[in-house]
């Protein structure tokens, strides 16, 4: 800015000197030389005006580009939310590990039902979920092979010793097969996997919980609506080794997720049911996320009502409201 002011001052000084000289020529009657100086001044003035106009145009273009970049960044956050929801966030990292399911920390998780003796109804809940691609296209179908790990914990942080009340571990292997259906482009993929889930407690105090499933799921995307149905088959166990023989009665054989994905927010509804008219059991979960500061960190609200939020409580009805961020 100082350079521009100095340049303009110099131009004004030069123009004033030239103008004074032209006036002197006029007084002497030499109009030809006076007109030549006037022409030079006019050309200098027009070049400065053109330069100023170009500068203003350049600034306007930069401003417009800045606005466009900001809009594109906002759109990128929307695509990031969708990729994270589908488990397709392949951000570069040396180990090739990326996010799988939602990763969140909810420091305020309140249960409207008892969590057992000596347990506080208020606790924290968090989930870590990652995956790694092993290889791809072995069958020539553009399929991808993954291993994944998800850990969900319920943490009694408001108690004196802050013990972990329950932790569920879910290692799995799955294959993603892209679907290229000309008339059904909203079908994105077909996923087939095997999933183990346990709470790692062994047999002490009859609190051990575990089961194994084979599942198939798909993702159906229409505009900003995402529908993800999943069906599973429980791999049978010996009655003597089965920690939770009635788990299918409470968890059923399927769940569905229906989500709306906005530019800076999402709403998701999860439904699960055993489809029994007599002694019906199931669960509903509502998730709401909002990117408050437009930086990819979402404020997150979660409501759960039903059975099977955790393995230790799979046969207990719980209603819980939790909030935090993801």
Label the predicted regions.
Residues 25, 96-121, 135-263, 271-273, ...:
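Outer-membrane pore/translocation modules
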Residues 52-112:
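N-terminal regions that are enriched for targeting/export leaders
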Residues 126:
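Gly/Thr-rich phosphate-binding loop signature of adenosyl cofactor/nucleotide-binding cores
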Residues 1-79:
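Cleavable N-terminal export/targeting peptides
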Residues 266-292, 297:
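Glycine/small-residue-rich hydrophobic helix-like segments
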Residues 130, 301:
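Conserved, mostly hydrophobic/aromatic
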Residues 317-326:
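Outer-membrane beta-barrel "beta-signal"
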């Amino acid at each position: 800015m100082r350079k521009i002011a100095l340049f303009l001052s110099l131009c004004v000084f030069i123009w004033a000197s030239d103008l004074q000289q032209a006036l002197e020529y006029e007084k002497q009657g030499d109009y030809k030389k006076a007109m030549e100086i006037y022409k030079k001044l006019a050309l200098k003035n027009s070049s400065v005006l053109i330069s100023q106009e170009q500068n203003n145009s350049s600034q306007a273009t930069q401003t417009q580009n800045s606005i466009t970049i900001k809009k594109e960044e906002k759109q990128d956050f929307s695509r990031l939310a969708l990729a994270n929801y589908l488990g397709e966030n392949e951000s570069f990292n040396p180990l090739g590990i990326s996010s799988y399911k939602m990763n969140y920390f909810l420091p305020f998780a309140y249960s409207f039902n008892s969590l057992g003796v000596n347990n506080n109804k208020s606790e924290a809940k968090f989930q870590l979920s990652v995956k790694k691609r092993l290889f791809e296209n072995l069958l020539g179908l553009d399929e991808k092979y993954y291993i994944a790990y998800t850990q969900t914990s319920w943490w009694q942080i408001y108690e004196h010793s802050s013990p972990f009340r329950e932790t569920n571990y879910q290692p799995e292997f799955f294959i993603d097969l892209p679907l290229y259906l000309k008339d059904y482009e909203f079908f994105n993929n077909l996923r087939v996997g095997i999933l183990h889930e346990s709470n790692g407690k062994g047999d002490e105090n009859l609190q051990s919980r575990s089961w194994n499933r084979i599942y198939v799921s798909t993702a159906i995307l229409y505009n900003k609506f995402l529908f993800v149905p999943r069906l599973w088959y429980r791999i049978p166990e010996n009655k003597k080794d089965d920690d939770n023989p009635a788990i299918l009665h409470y968890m059923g054989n399927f769940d569905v997720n229906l989500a709306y994905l906005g530019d800076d927010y999402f709403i998701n509804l999860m439904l699960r049911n055993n489809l029994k008219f007599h002694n019906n059991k199931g669960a509903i979960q509502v998730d709401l996320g909002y990117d408050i500061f437009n930086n990819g960190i979402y404020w997150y609200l979660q409501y759960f009502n039903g059975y099977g939020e955790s393995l230790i409580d799979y046969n207990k009805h719980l209603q819980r409201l939790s909030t935090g961020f993801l």
